[in-house]
C-alpha cells in the first residue's frame, strides 16, 4: 500500500530545492489511507465498504509571513511541481489578497522513517470473512443477554503519511487503527436506552485475537445488560454531591475541558489564557493532580510526528495543579507564550493542520490500589474499594458515574456538560441504581475536587474528536476511578 510514498525521494528533493530557491518554507504532506468497514445487525451485513485515498498538500510561508495551502488527489510529479509554483505565487500576493501574516518559524530538521510493518494485511482484508466473524460475535452477545437489539461493527484503517520540508526534513510514519464495537439498545415500549462498547488494536485481525475477543465479549455483555436494565431505573435526584467517576469519564473531562482550552490556536478565547497568552504557572487544581497529553505507541490515537513533520512531544498541560504546557504548533507557540510541543494534526492532506490532542489523561499522585482488571469492577466492587479506603467516613453516600456518553465544554468559560451511562449511589448500606443524568459545572471546580484515585492508569477510552470541520482519533483515560469531593460548582441533573 505504501509503495507510492516510498518512491517520493526525488520529487521531495525537487520540491525542497525549488522552495529554497524561491525563499519560502515549504511543507509537503503526502498521505495514503485505506479504510475497511463492516456493520452487522440481526444476523446479516447491513453495510460494508472499502475506501482508499491518496494525495498531497503543499503549504508555503514566505519571508514576509504570508502563506498559502493547496492540495491534489494524486502524487504525480508534474502536477505537484505546478501546484507548488501556484502556491508560491499566491503567498507572494498575500498583502494584496489581505492574508494574515505569521512569523516564519525556525524548525529543527527531522529525518525518520516508520512505515507500516505489514501494509498488505490492511488492503487484503477479506470483508466477507470479517462479516461472518461479526455475525458470530453478534450471535454470541445475543445469546448471553436477551431483551436488547444489538449492532456490531468493525473498522480497520491504515493512515500513512510522508512529510517533506524545504529544510531537508523527511518523516514517514503509518498509524494502524482497528476497532470492533457494538451498541445494545433496550427493546420494547417506553423509554429506550443505548449503551456502546469498543475494543481497539493495531492489527486488522483483532476479531480473531483471543484476548481482544474475550475483552470485547465481556464489555459487550456488560453494555447489553445495562441497556436492558436502564428503562426500569429511577431518575437520580439533582444537586451537588461527592462523586466517583471512572477512567472513561475522566478522559472526557481532561479532553473536552482542559485539552481543548490548552490548544494554542484558541488562546484568544480560552479561559486558560489572557490576551492570547497561556497563563503558565497559574494554579487550577490540587497539587496532587496533573493532566498530560502525549502519543502512546500502539494506541488508537498514536501519532509520532506532527503534520508539520516535527517529533510530537509530551505536553504536561497541568503540572501538579499548575498550568504548564500548551498544545502548540510552530505558528502558535511564541504568540501563545508556550513552548513548541508539535501538536499539529490534520484529518487529511486537504486540511490545514491544527493543534490537537492525542492520548490525554488525568494522573494523580500516590493512587490507592485496585487489584485486577477494570472490567472486574461493578458498582459493588467500587463500593468495597471506597469502604476499604475509609472514604465513607468522609462521605456517607457517593454517586458513582459509570461510563462516558459524550459532552461538550465552552472553552471561553470552562463550563461543561457531560453524559454518563449510569449512576449508582454507593453507601455502607448498599448500592442503588439510577438512570444516567447530566454531569455539569465548572471544569475548575471538578479538577479542584479530585481527592483520591484508585488503580493503575487505563488509557483505552477511544473515540473521534471534531474541530473546525476535521475529525481525528482521540484516546485517553486516568486511573480506574477518581473520587471527587462535593463542590458547589459541580452538580448532577435529574428531575
Model-derived regions: residue spans:
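Acidic low-complexity segments
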Residues: 1-5, 10-12, 17, 25-37, ...
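A generic local secondary-structure boundary/capping motif
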Residues: 16, 46-49, 126, 138-144, ...
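Structured beta-strand/loop patches that form or line metal/cofactor-binding pockets in enzymes
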Residues: 21-56, 147-171, 396-419
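N-terminal alpha-helical targeting/anchoring segments
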Residues: 34-92
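Short acidic, glycine/serine/threonine-rich loops at helix termini
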Residues: 37-43, 158-176, 192-199, 253-259, ...
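Internal alpha/beta scaffold segment
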Residues: 67, 74-100, 175-261, 319-325, ...
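Extended amphipathic alpha-helical scaffolds
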Residues: 128-214, 259, 264-292
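Dual-mode signal for accessory low-complexity, basic/Gly-rich regions
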Residues: 268, 276-495
